[in-house]
Swiss-Prot record:
The lineage of its organism: Bacteria, Pseudomonadati, Pseudomonadota, Gammaproteobacteria, Pasteurellales. InterPro entries: ATPase_NBD (IPR043129), Chaperone_DnaK (IPR012725), Heat_shock_70_CS (IPR018181), HSP70_C_sf (IPR029048), HSP70_peptide-bd_sf (IPR029047), Hsp_70_fam (IPR013126). This is Chaperone protein DnaK. The gene is dnaK. One of its GO terms (molecular function) is ATP-dependent protein folding chaperone. PANTHER family: HEAT SHOCK PROTEIN 70KDA (PTHR19375). Residues 598-635 are annotated as: Disordered. Signal peptide: none annotated. It comes from Actinobacillus succinogenes (strain ATCC 55618 / DSM 22257 / CCUG 43843 / 130Z). The modification Phosphothreonine is found at T199. Residues 600-618 have a biased composition (Low complexity).
Length: 635
């Protein structure tokens, strides 16, 4: 079996590693560097450049030099994060036919996985040059808070690059593998703070050692897939542009060439200020107007830089609090803090992390290489070369389906260890319903419409039966890559339908963050909505039962006896259309009271049926009414 390489496909830089004997080794690229810029350029000679060669020519070819493509992968063009990038990127971001965010290079439309594949190809070639053999298999890392669409798109990029992606693993988990592999015996709980070029993750991981085998179990994860070093760079660039405009009266934002030079200078200044207190940004001949050439020369202090990005660092601390809460741990129960990602070299970041956790973060983990090293370790596990490591990761978001009354019924809670499989039995909402629609949702809200729709599919050919009788078993299966598969099976006929959630319905991180924030802020509103839906469902069931009894009673009830019952049914149906829970409950009680004569008339005839339904109901424990669309055969 060939080697399975480990690739950290980063927003700013990428890295590749492999197990060399029993030790992971980071491989130098053709330029002699251990990391490769995630930059791709398309030249006028139709040549594709990747890494340092692409970065070197960026100033003279800004519109055809692509960077930070990971921020677009698996995203919709309409996403707020994409729209922000549309305004600041020198290259053209466009809407694809399927609604995804793509890029336009010289009139050619390119999908982000297609572009990222160029970086993966270079990583593959780097490994092949070192190993002297063809590489076909890889473990690729993604931010822990990447959703299903983004994970799918990353796997697609691997396929385009000619790699069989054996596993997608989360970056903080990979870093924990790199950290914990050579540490001494004993159990410990660590926090991995991963602030990279474009994404942020925080994972709480427990490392246990039992009988010589190390288990890495993720207790909780949280993050922001649109927060990273690129955002810090943009703050510096905007400051330099504004200062230059004040001094010279020229806005450089309209000049792609000048902006590309500023991007390089801004990133360089930010890096220098991690070790120096002050730096000069000096760009001669940055632009020109009628009065002649203009030169940019601006002093930037560390204090000014920290003031520019203070809110970004503060923003990173919110997911830290949520992850700790989800793990059920206090700060004092964290034994070690590991910093991953180049942006964690910034003194302000290190200071804020140390203040929050009450301890200095570890300095013995290389923030640029740890993720690739961990991916290589996982590659060793999958190929059987590493046998004493077990990795248990989690899914970052709750998953479920829409059920009767527009409620999301959760089957798999967030922070559930993966791979995982969960089934629940649902039923029909109408008599003689021949088909159901399974609507798959991702999020933390009770109200189905407040969550993200991942897809839907039909299960047809259900045998005609009264509502509540058919048993539809819905199964959610999340594989080790965190990718979702859903199936529905009619237990009566054995018919089954399934779906693998496709990447075309990407879920943005801002939406995820908003879902969690909304779920916390709107807990009371969610509770009231749930109570309203419950009242509606009970009222619907009461109306259904009353109408059925009226039909069965036939001429045993006089028209005078039927009139008030039919009026009460009509009033209850009107109340159900509204949003007043108290009114629905009052009209339900009124219907029960006027239905007394009907109950007496129908009692004898319905007794046998009622007993049968009760015994059937005893076997239906845990069956949830689901609101499904009936698919008409004659359509």
């Amino acid at each position: 079996m060939g080697k399975i390489i480990g690739i950290d496909l980063g927003t700013t830089n990428s890295c590749v590693a492999v197990m060399d004997g029993d030790k992971p080794r980071v491989i130098e690229n053709a330029e002699g560097d251990r990391t490769t810029p995630s930059i791709i350029a398309y030249t006028n000679d139709n040549e594709t450049l990747v890494g340092q060669p692409a970065k070197r020519q960026a100033v003279t070819n800004p519109k055809n030099t692509l960077f930070a493509i990971k921020r677009l992968i698996g995203r919709r063009f309409e996403d707020n994060e994409v729209q922000r990038d549309v305004d600041i990127m020198p290259f053209k971001i466009i809407r694809a036919d399927n609604g995804d965010a793509w890029v336009d290079v010289k009139g050619d439309k390119l999908a982000p996985p297609q572009v990222s594949a160029e970086v993966l190809k270079k990583m593959k070639k780097t490994a092949e040059d070192f190993l002297g053999e063809t590489v076909t298999e890889a473990v690729i890392t993604v931010p822990a808070y990447f959703n299903d669409a983004q994970r799918q798109a990353t796997k697609d990029a691997g396929r385009i690059a000619g790699l069989d992606v054996k596993r997608i693993i989360n970056e903080p988990t990979a870093a924990a593998l790199a950290y914990g592999l050579d540490k001494g015996k004993g159990n410990q709980t660590i926090a991995v703070y991963d602030l990279g070029g474009g994404t942020f993750d925080l994972s709480i991981i427990e490392i246990d050692e039992v009988g010589g085998e190390k288990t890495f179990e993720v207790l909780a994860t949280n993050g922001d897939t649109h927060l990273g070093g690129e955002d810090f760079d943009n703050r510096v660039i905007n400051y330099l542009v504004d200062e230059f405009k004040k001094e010279q009266g020229v806005d450089l934002r309209n000049d792609p060439l000048a902006m590309q030079r500023l991007k390089e200078a801004g990133e360089k200044a930010k890096i220098e200020l991690s070790s120096a207190q002050q730096t000069d940004v000096n760009l001669p001949y940055i632009t020109a107007d009628a009065t002649g050439p203009k030169h940019l020369n601006i002093k930037l202090t560390r204090a000014k830089l920290e003031a520019l990005v203070e809110d970004l660092v503060a923003r990173s601390m919110e997911p830290v609090k949520v992850a700790l809460k989800d793990a059920g741990l206090s700060v004092s129960e964290i034994d070690d803090v590991i910093l991953v990602g180049g942006q964690t070299r910034m003194p302000l970041v290190q200071q804020k992390v140390a203040e929050f956790f009450g301890k200095e973060p570890r300095k013995d983990v290389n923030p640029d290489e740890a993720v690739a090293v961990g991916a290589a370790v996982q590659g060793g596990v999958l190929s059987g070369n590493v046998t004493d490591v077990l990795l248990l990761d989690v899914t970052p978001l709750s998953l479920g389906i829409e059920t009767m009354g527009g409620v999301m019924t959760t089957l798999i809670e967030k922070n559930t260890t993966i791979p995982t499989k969960k089934s629940q039995v649902f039923s029909t909402a109408e008599d003689n319903q021949s088909a159901v629609t399974i609507h798959v949702l991702q999020g933390e809200r009770k109200q189905a419409s407040a969550n993200k729709s991942l897809g839907q599919f039909n299960l047809e050919g259900i045998n005609p039966a009264p509502r509540g009788m058919p048993q539809i078993e819905v199964t959610f299966d999340i594989d080790a890559d965190g990718i979702i598969h859903v199936s529905a099976k009619d237990k009566g006929t054995g018919k089954e339908q399934q779906i693998t959630i496709k990447a075309s319905s990407g879920l943005s991180d801002e939406e995820i963050q908003q879902m969690v924030r909304d779920a916390e802020a709107n807990a009371d509103a969610d509770r009231k909505f749930e109570e309203l839906v419950q009242a509606r469902n009970q009222a619907d069931a009461l109306v259904h039962a009353t109408r059925k009894q009226l039909t069965e009673a036939g001429d045993k009830l006089s028209a005078d006896d039927k009139a008030p019952i039919e009026k009460a049914v009509s009033e209850l149906e009107d109340a159900v259309k509204g949003d007043d829970k108290d009114a629905i409950e009052a009209k339900s009680q009124a219907l029960i009271q006027v239905s007394e004569k009907l109950m007496q008339a129908a009692q004898q005839q319905a007794q046998a049926n009622t007993q049968g339904q009760q015994s059937q109901g005893g076997n239906d424990d845990g069956v949830v009414d689901a609101e499904f669309e009936e698919v008409k055969d004659n359509k």
